[in-house]
Amino acid sequence: MMNKESFGACLLLTLPEDVFAVISRFLSPSDICNLILCGKSLPALVDTEKMWLVQCEEVKVLPLLEIVQWRIGISSYKALCRFLVEVVKPLLGIWVQQNPELGNVVYVMPGFLSVVGCRIIPQKVAPSWIQEDRVKWSPVFEIICGFDGSNGFFLHGRDKEGSCLYPGFVMGIEKSCNVLQLDVVPRQEKSSCNEIERGASREEGEIPFWMLAFSDRKNLLNIVTSHVSLHVVEPLNEMLFPTLKYDEAMLVERRTILLKMHKFGGNWKNMNLEEDDQLCYNPMQVKINEMLENLGDDYFFDEEELIEVTPTENTNVLGESSSSKNTTPSQSEIRVSNRQSFLSSGDTFGLGLTASYSEMSYYKGWPYMHFHHFLLYKLPVKKAVDQEAYAGLWGGTIGCPAGKCPKGKTEKSLYLLMLTYEESEEHSERVLIGTKILEGKRYVRHPNGTAMFVVKIDTPSLDPFPVDANETHFENSYSGEGIAEGYSFRYTGSKPGSLFVITNDLLAFVWKETKVVITLQRLNLTEILKKGLGSCVPPLPPSKNFTYMRRSFINEFTKLSTDSSYSE
């Protein structure tokens, strides 16, 4: 008698192909893999290009046209699905860091057979900026997809000679990741050229990178990046994603170059990807211990950076003293011991990117952060739904809707706000919070994470719009409070105001006393950047380009200090 498993397999085989294609949309990639293992006959039905194309669609990170375009540079839709599920989907979104206070927003989006991180630069924009799609940005990192669906990491940055790429390893990406960490990672050397290299496993008592003193971590990153750096010309540095300027052939050529760089380092021009892996020297790794014999232990001493340590580091590595003279011997010995333990954990060292999940606390949608770790934090930006119609990412400027305000300056500071819904702790009512994540001024009074306004979404406002709005229909208006005097992002003052809803994609908040207006439009940064009409700002040096560690209230993301786009 036929068992149940065999009967189920036979039943699937009798289904018409189009019917099974519909059913497959309700299956996950892991379900498909399990079906492949169920019997000898099922793989022919399930493990097909058509079936994996459906799975690529169901990941819902790329439109069908781009999925088909990406297939050109990869072995199969199955390999592509692996990259979309394991790399692209978990990383997409907005990542932030508190420092510098003016704005550190990294937007992660699909590239071309890659996922790319682009920093949105604090800037000034014209009133029609969203229609013209002109946004300044700078490259931060990218993860490229190999022919077999594998991945390779590049950090962007620059040195005195120009823009550079810094190849490294993807150490792991959790599906629900909310912390992105840049590390120096220990590696074990290959015993032979054909052996697969793996990261060094941590034994009990070994010190992880994040437990080192801040200055040690910074110096190790500087050592590694300076030795793996690969200089690139600006067009290669800018073509991170498809735009109107770059055709598919140019993107394919760029990806081929990146794959060569990741595999062969500085010798990539003379190598072919098809060549056998007989290169014993790994261009992504540095033998730090050999270098340190010549540098000496004083290389890691940085008196200025001893001040910048977190409370966690104080208890494990450093004291709170502000100079080396006040550092107790025991604390200094612990610091040296930790560093030596870390350096002994691998034969070579390279750059590593890890995306992990961590339990976090939030204040009005803004995560509490470690300021002196090389970390980016994912913002929980929600999509608009029926009961939360205004949730999501918004951008705007101080000023009335187009045509409603007196003529003034042609360019104004760009604000990016995350709108989220919460339950008010005081009155148990729903509120809409507009959290500022970027401000385009040269100097900022209130830092990242500041609530620009808090609106009682169930309380209508009877206040009039401050200028003639005869031609503008307001769907709704709600009472609330907007930021006033105060300091930090937790202790801001507030004054009464109202939120006016022009459409579901156009809002205006008005401070009642001053009549100041901030007009916001719903944003799709992917669409804006892919128009290619904005400008690419050169990146910072590598470690600063990932996370800028110093507290600063001025714009650190451009060297063009005379650029009017960054003035008050």
From Swiss-Prot:
Biased amino acid composition, Low complexity:
321-332
Which residues are in the F-box domain?
9-55
User: Disordered: where is this region?
Assistant: 315-337
Recorded GO cellular component terms are: plastid
Supply the name of the protein: Putative F-box protein At5g39480
Q: Which organism is it from?
A: Arabidopsis thaliana (Mouse-ear cress)
